[in-house]
Amino acid sequence: MNNDEVKPQHLYLTGYRGCGKSTLAKLLAQKLSLPSVDLDDVIETTAGKSIAEIFANETEVGFRDREEAALMEVSRRPQHVIALGGGTILREANRNIIANSGWCVWLDAEPDVLVARLAGDATTADRRPSLTDQSVFDEVQSVMSHREPLYRASADLRIDTSHRNMDEILTEVLKAAPSSIGQADLS
């Protein structure tokens, strides 16, 4: 079956934090004439608190419950570009929602590149909690090794963003995306 025969509703972006999901979602939405949504923003708005506060008050399980509910809600909207949280793919229910409602791009990057990006992101420490008690580099390696098979299984396309700029990544996604997603402006 070719990409034109598949009629996905949404374009999902998955990958570890710092890989460029939120930035790329906005660029893709503009090029495809679609709205974009960041799942973490939906969760924070609905909860009225930051992800770090949700983790602190409700534990990771509470956060993942909120994440699943938010994904279900946004998946029912008209076509969007959706930046998923880095761990959204941890739950089978979420992977099923993604598979049944859209086309998914896995933005990947080398651990040292992710660490550098996270160090340069002022919101990371305030907004996103540490998932382990390890150093940032060790945490990235550990979490990525656990999530990689899930990203791989969920993705229709994998892009290594390590040494590429957003324009290159944007072009690759637009060229690979099924024609049923948005109205691409390739100019």
UniProtKB/Swiss-Prot annotation:
This is Shikimate kinase. GO terms for molecular function: ATP binding; magnesium ion binding; shikimate kinase activity. Substrate binds at residues 40, 64, 86, 147. GO terms for biological process: amino acid biosynthetic process; aromatic amino acid family biosynthetic process; chorismate biosynthetic process. It comes from Rhodopirellula baltica (strain DSM 10527 / NCIMB 13988 / SH1). Keywords: Amino-acid biosynthesis, Aromatic amino acid biosynthesis, ATP-binding, Cytoplasm, Kinase, Magnesium, Metal-binding, Nucleotide-binding, Transferase. HAMAP family: Shikimate_kinase (MF_00109). Belongs to the shikimate kinase family. It is found in: Cytoplasm.
